[in-house]
Amino acid sequence: MATKTIESSSRSGPRRTGVGSLLKPLNSEYGKVAPGWGTTPLMGVAMALFAIFLSIILEIYNSSVLLDGISIN
C-alpha cells in the first residue's frame, strides 16, 4: 500500500503550552454572534471612504478630473 497508518498509544491528549493557555480565552467566544447589526454601519462607512480614496487615486493616475487646471512643464 502507498499509505501507512501508525497508531501511537503514547499520546494521551493535546499538549498544553503557555501560548495556548494565553489564547484560550479568545477562542472561547468562537461561533457566538452578537445580536443586531453590530459594527456593520461602521464597516459600510469604511468601505465608502475606501471607494472614494480609490477613485481619487485613479483620477490622479489617469490625469483626468483633478489635474485639468494644472500645467506640467
Swiss-Prot record:
Transmembrane segments: 41-61
Record-level GO BP terms: photosynthesis; protein stabilization
GO cellular component terms, A-Z: chloroplast thylakoid membrane; photosystem II
GO molecular function: phosphate ion binding
Keywords (A to Z) from UniProt: Chloroplast, Membrane, Phosphoprotein, Photosynthesis, Photosystem II, Plastid, Thylakoid, Transmembrane, Transmembrane helix
Pfam families per the UniProt record, alphabetical: PsbH
Subcellular compartments: Plastid, Chloroplast thylakoid membrane
Region (Disordered): 1-21
InterPro entries (alphabetical): PSII_PsbH, PSII_PsbH_sf
Biased composition (Polar residues): 1-12
Membrane topology reported for the UniProt record: Single-pass membrane protein
Range of residues in the leader sequence: none
Statement: the UniProt record of this protein carries the keyword Phosphoprotein: yes
Post-translational modification as stated in the protein's UniProt record: Phosphorylation is a light-dependent reaction catalyzed by a membrane-bound kinase; phosphorylation occurs on Thr residue(s) in the N-terminus of the protein.
Modified-residue entries (Phosphothreonine), positions: T3, T5
Function statement: One of the components of the core complex of photosystem II (PSII), required for its stability and/or assembly. PSII is a light-driven water:plastoquinone oxidoreductase that uses light energy to abstract electrons from H(2)O, generating O(2) and a proton gradient subsequently used for ATP formation. It consists of a core antenna complex that captures photons, and an electron transfer chain that converts photonic excitation into a charge separation.
Subunit structure, as described in the record: PSII is composed of 1 copy each of membrane proteins PsbA, PsbB, PsbC, PsbD, PsbE, PsbF, PsbH, PsbI, PsbJ, PsbK, PsbL, PsbM, PsbT, PsbX, PsbY, PsbZ, Psb30/Ycf12, at least 3 peripheral proteins of the oxygen-evolving complex and a large number of cofactors. It forms dimeric complexes.
Membership in a protein family: Belongs to the PsbH family.
Protein's recorded name: Photosystem II reaction center protein H
Native organism: Phalaenopsis aphrodite subsp. formosana
Lineage: Eukaryota, Viridiplantae, Streptophyta, Embryophyta, Tracheophyta
Designated gene of the protein: psbH
